[in-house]
């Protein structure tokens, strides 16, 4: 079924910044997608086109990207008369229209909005849910797998004040029997965590960051992990709920010195206290020995490949090492990471690569190498729930979409609750097998 109309506009994301929304009209009606955006972005990501006009939205406007959809993509794609069910052909056409390697001409945010809306239109035409269409596109087997939610409950790094260098601490309810129960456990721990945080750090420490986690004035990773393990214990889930970290260490890597500055938010940081990657790797190993850590994302900087390979080699496969800034959902970097044994899991962000087809291929490349795949939101999110359907359709088994707070985060988690209810016994919960869910 061809497309009769494509229209884009700007709307606002969860940080109050403009972002791209795309409507596609076919015989089945209107299909809408909204594109997210990140705060700590990898330097190799596909180009998110912003206006750069400092007099409006501090340069973060997306009127150029919107115009590119309305004036370049819309007439060309409608004229091409492609079937919306042929996602690969649509995405290839969009990439050809752009003609650059990282979508700098039209903008990945413009292209992705169209790509996502096309997938929704195709699902409607096939009269199946979006997750079932994604499953068809990626050729995954049945039953469907419901993901373990990685809930970011304590924020540090670039997402928060305080001196804590690591960006995210997540709870992982992998011991639950179902997604519904995992959500309940996670929500209960989150409530305990909020009240503990207020008790220890004062009332205002209960305020939440961009992704719904608390951001108290914490100095060290141990302090954050103690707070979380205490909350897990108070909620009665010790042993069932694990912990994950996203270090986002590119944010505090000093490239010239090849060292890491754990006090990077202090303008007068003491250079003599900056540490080597070996010292940082030792810290991770000590933390993993003391706390139930099952996954560490971006433990080293995106260009510090040597550090990644060293850590992979010396840490064994006890926990998941996730590449985000390292791999930026890009087939070239994923291939390099596989060859150099840099990590064993991919963080999949559709807006890092810019089309549904390329996101699916990135996941398939990762699965083929025996990696895990974690589907992820961005810190600037919207009410769009496409990634909830993607994680189920891909059988990825793990999703990172913030704390059980703030509607733009819960929109995705609530969508997975609905999917679980709809599928009933035609789905299994990934649980402790989240790293190898594709094989379940």
UniProtKB/Swiss-Prot annotation:
Mg(2+) binds at residues 246, 297, 324. It catalyses: (2R)-2-phosphoglycerate = phosphoenolpyruvate + H2O. Gene3D superfamilies: Enolase-like C-terminal domain, Enolase-like, N-terminal domain. InterPro entries: Enolase, Enolase-like_C_sf, Enolase-like_N, Enolase_C, Enolase_CS, Enolase_N. GO terms for biological process: glycolytic process. Residues 120-189 are annotated as: IgE-binding determinant. Its cofactor is Mg(2+). It is found in: Cytoplasm. GO terms for cellular component: phosphopyruvate hydratase complex. Its EC number is 4.2.1.11. The active site is at 211 (proton donor), 349 (proton acceptor). GO terms for molecular function: magnesium ion binding; phosphopyruvate hydratase activity. Substrate binds at residues 159, 168, 297, 324, 376-379, 400. Belongs to the enolase family. Homodimer. This is Enolase. It comes from Davidiella tassiana.
């Amino acid at each position: 079924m061809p497309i009769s109309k494509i229209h884009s506009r700007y709307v606002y994301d969860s940080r109050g910044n403009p972002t791209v929304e795309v409507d596609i009209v076919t015989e089945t009606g209107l299909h809408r997608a909204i594109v997210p955006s990140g705060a700590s972005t990898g330097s190799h990501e596909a180009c998110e086109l912003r206006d750069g006009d400092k007099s409006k939205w501090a340069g973060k406007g997306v009127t150029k990207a919107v115009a590119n959809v309305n004036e370049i993509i819309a007439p060309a794609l409608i004229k091409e008369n492609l079937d919306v069910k042929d996602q690969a052909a649509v995405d290839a056409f969009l990439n050809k229209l752009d003609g650059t390697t990282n979508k700098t001409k039209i903008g990945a945010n413009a292209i992705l909005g169209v790509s996502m809306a096309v997938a929704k239109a195709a699902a409607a035409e096939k009269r199946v849910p979006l997750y079932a269409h994604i499953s068809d596109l990626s050729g995954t087997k049945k039953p469907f797998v419901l993901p373990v939610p990685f809930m970011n409950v304590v924020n540090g790094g670039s997402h928060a004040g305080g001196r804590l260098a690591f960006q995210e601490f997540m709870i992982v309810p992998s011991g639950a029997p179902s997604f519904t129960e995992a959500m309940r456990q996670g929500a209960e721990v989150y409530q305990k965590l909020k009240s503990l945080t207020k008790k220890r750090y004062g009332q205002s420490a209960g305020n939440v960051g961009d992704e719904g986690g608390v951001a108290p004035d914490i100095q060290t990773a141990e302090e954050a992990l103690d707070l979380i393990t205490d909350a897990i214990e108070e909620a009665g889930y010790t042993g069932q709920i694990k912990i994950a970290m996203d270090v986002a260490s590119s944010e505090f890597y000093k490239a010239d010195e090849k060292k890491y500055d754990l006090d990077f938010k202090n303008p007068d940081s003491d250079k003599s206290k900056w540490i080597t990657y070996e010292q940082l790797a030792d810290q991770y190993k000590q933390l993993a020995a003391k706390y139930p850590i099952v996954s560490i994302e971006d433990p080293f900087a995106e260009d510090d490949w040597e550090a990644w390979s060293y850590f992979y080699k010396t840490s064994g496969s006890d926990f998941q090492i996730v590449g985000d800034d390292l791999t930026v959902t890009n087939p070239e970097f994923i291939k390099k990471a596989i060859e150099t044994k840099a990590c064993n899991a991919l963080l999949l962000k559709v807006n890092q690569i810019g089309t549904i087809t390329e996101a699916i291929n990135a996941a398939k490349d990762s699965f083929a190498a025996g990696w895990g795949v974690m589907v992820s939101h961005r810190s600037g999110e919207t009410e769009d729930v496409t990634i909830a359907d993607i994680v189920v359709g891909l059988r990825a088994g793990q999703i990172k979409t913030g704390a059980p707070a703030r509607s733009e985060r819960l929109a995705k988690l609530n969508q997975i609750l609905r999917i679980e209810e709809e599928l009933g016994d035609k789905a299994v919960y990934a649980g402790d097998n989240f790293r190898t869910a594709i094989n379940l």
